[in-house]
């Protein structure tokens, strides 16, 4: 199923543009970036029929949000967006492969799932993640969504993060109440829940938490991706005032998302 929405540009500072694309060429380039990050860097066992591409059935139903470097003419950041209507056509949210979301999805409101978020290794520590996150918040708030949901990954091993240390570094206000807690279909094995005192939180998870995201229970062990996934729920009502003051100040005329691009 092909997306029928027009390309929607969101202005970003300096050399970066962030926009939703329906271009098959750009989507394929994004899938190449995903493959580099998830398969080559993280060691994921991707169930793809095309070597060098990360592709699955969700790609045909979702929106593809990319950060594009105009100077080097390439995609340097990516996430995909799946709303509840697209998920219904697909048959599920991607996160439902890992968690039972029955109680969460029974809440009133509109849901937007984010996934496959990645940044080109050469651009980490730059403005790419901030640009991507700013555009994502703009899209969600202007689209009238009530919740962002998705999975934040924790890579284990010496070069990764210790899940217990991550939990110790999460503020109590970012731990979901019991009504939002979900159960993973495959819990993390005890052997991987190492207790070393490594500090720090993965950058993407840190960005979610900074905006008030809730960690909703125990992580899922994703053997294919060689990582632990935390289910994240971000209520958007609390972001609307912050968004309008921070992201829209002086940019109302140029940063609007076209109505046709919102489902």
Where are these regions (language model features)?
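Short amphipathic alpha-helix that is part of the acyltransferase structural core
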Residues: 3-76, 80-83
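Short, surface-exposed amphipathic charged segments that create phosphate/polyanion-binding patches used
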Residues: 36, 233-234
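Acyl-donor binding region in acyl/amide transferases
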Residues: 84-214, 219-227, 232, 239
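Long, contiguous binding/interaction regions
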Residues: 238-240, 244-247
């Amino acid at each position: 199923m092909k997306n029928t929405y027009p390309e929607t540009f969101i202005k970003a500072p300096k050399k970066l543009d962030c926009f939703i694309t329906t271009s098959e060429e750009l989507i394929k380039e994004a899938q190449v970036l995903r493959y580099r990050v998830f398969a080559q860097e993280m060691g994921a066992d991707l169930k793809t029929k095309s070597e060098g591409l990360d592709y699955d059935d969700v790609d045909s139903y979702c929106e593809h949000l990319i950060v594009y470097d105009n100077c080097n003419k390439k995609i340097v950041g990516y996430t995909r967006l799946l709303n509840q209507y697209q998920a219904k056509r697909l048959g599920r949210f991607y996160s439902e492969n890992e968690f039972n979301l029955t109680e969460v999805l029974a809440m009133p409101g509109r849901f937007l799932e984010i996934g496959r978020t990645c940044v080109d290794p050469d651009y980490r520590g730059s403005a790419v993640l901030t640009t991507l996150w700013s555009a994502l918040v703009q899209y969600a708030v202007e689209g009238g969504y009530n919740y962002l949901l998705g999975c934040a990954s924790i890579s284990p091993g010496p070069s990764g993060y210790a899940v217990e240390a991550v939990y110790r570094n999460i503020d109590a206000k970012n731990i979901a109440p019991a009504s939002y807690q979900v159960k993973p279909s495959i819990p993390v094995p005890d052997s991987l829940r190492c207790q070393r005192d490594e500090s720090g939180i993965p950058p993407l998870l840190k960005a979610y938490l900074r905006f008030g995201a809730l960690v909703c229970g125990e992580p899922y062990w994703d053997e294919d991706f060689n990582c632990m996934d935390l289910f994240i729920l971000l209520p958007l009502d609390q972001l609307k005032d912050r968004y309008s003051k921070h992201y829209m100040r002086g940019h109302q005329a140029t940063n609007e998302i076209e109505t046709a691009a919102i489902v």
